[in-house]
Amino acid sequence: MTKIPKYWTVAKKYLSKKDKVLSNLIKKYNSPSETVLTSRKDVFYSLCKSIIGQQISVAAANSVFLKFKKKCKNKINIKVVNKLNIIQLKSCGLSRQKAKGIKSLAKQTLNKTFNPKLIPRMSDEEAIIYLSQLRQIGRWSAEMILLFTYNRSNIWPVQDIGLLRAISKNYKKKYLPPKSFVDYLKNKHSPYCSVAVW
């Protein structure tokens, strides 16, 4: 894991001034043991984990991921994963579609049709579109990669159930909160939406 993003402290001060609700939440959770956004900076690892975790419980995802990690002999990298076949991947508990997604990811990364090194130079939207071209990776998954792997400062995943529930709870709105209000908060919290989401 890496250090906290450089923008973290500035973002908290900015959001505290802009939004009374967030100001109260930041004060509530502001402590030496505060959990902050960090990253392992390994996009291939993160994409594999993202594909594995789709549409299953956290417990199930963790179980499958541990089996996958063991199958990779604790070395989740492109060359190791590329040597695994679909049957080996399925034996970890992966569906055929997810196994194909991970195989495709390894192949595309090896032949450079997918090049993660290009992403830091892209805008958020360009990066989302680029990542979404990968098999088994949709917009929400791409946003999670930008948030948790690249630590982009202004990600606002409007399809995220956790975010929508948090908005409903903290801003006293019905669930689902109106799109107009979600968009209003995005504009209000920009350019530090990622910190607001966290």
Where in the sequence are the language-model features?
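C-terminal end-helix/capping segment
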Residues: 160-175, 180-187
